[in-house]
Amino acid sequence: MKKNLKKIYRIIVKKNFDIIYGKLILASEVFFKNNVLVKKVFFSNNKGRSYNVYIVDNCRVYSDNSENVAVIKNKYLLPKISIQLGKNQLIEASNNNILKTGTRKLIQKKVKGNVLCLIQGISAINNYGHWILDILPKLCVAEKYKDLNDFDAIYLPNIKKKFQIDSLSYFGINPNKFIDGSAIRHIYAEKLTIPQHPYWKINKGQLDTVANIDPDIINLLKQKFMNIQNVTKAKRIFIDRSDSNFFHNQIINY
């Protein structure tokens, strides 16, 4: 009975939001090319390795805060820059679950100007590893394209964790620009900028592809974090994982 009621409720919600925003359709390659500007950035003189930065005008972003993020222009879900995960890997945009469920929230925030979008579902909301290896490298890609403070807003997976605020401080960004994606799941932007993910590949496991993360990005992050004045050396370092939501990879301090 409860399952049937939930199913009916979801159908009603979807129909209502389809009336408001239109039924979502997967965009064609032609629509994508006509509406998405693509720029390339490089981290070194090695022109064999580049990263795309995607720019879209007048669009929406909706996240289910799980495994799907939809970047929507008019009523079209844009492939390549929307995110859909399955079995710990990036899958084809046609499998984005938001195509089925629709956007289940009204627009929570409208932003005038250019929004840098870094959200990617649940993976980086609380997970330190995904934050360090996914979100910060995407910030580095965006920084190669444009001064981060030139963006009018920066849409992040979460800004509640201390490690998130601490690591962002090394980029010198005005915190007033931050939008908390864990609370604000549906936005409209006059202009949206999305940097390419540093290592995700379609139908490739994340644990396999993370080994291919660009050494130039790692070195750039290392330079940012190590550029600290008057650091006192310590014989030992205490690492605390007690606030982690994950019970694997725990550390014993001696």
Model regions and ranges:
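The feature primarily captures lumenal catalytic ectodomains
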Residues: 1-254
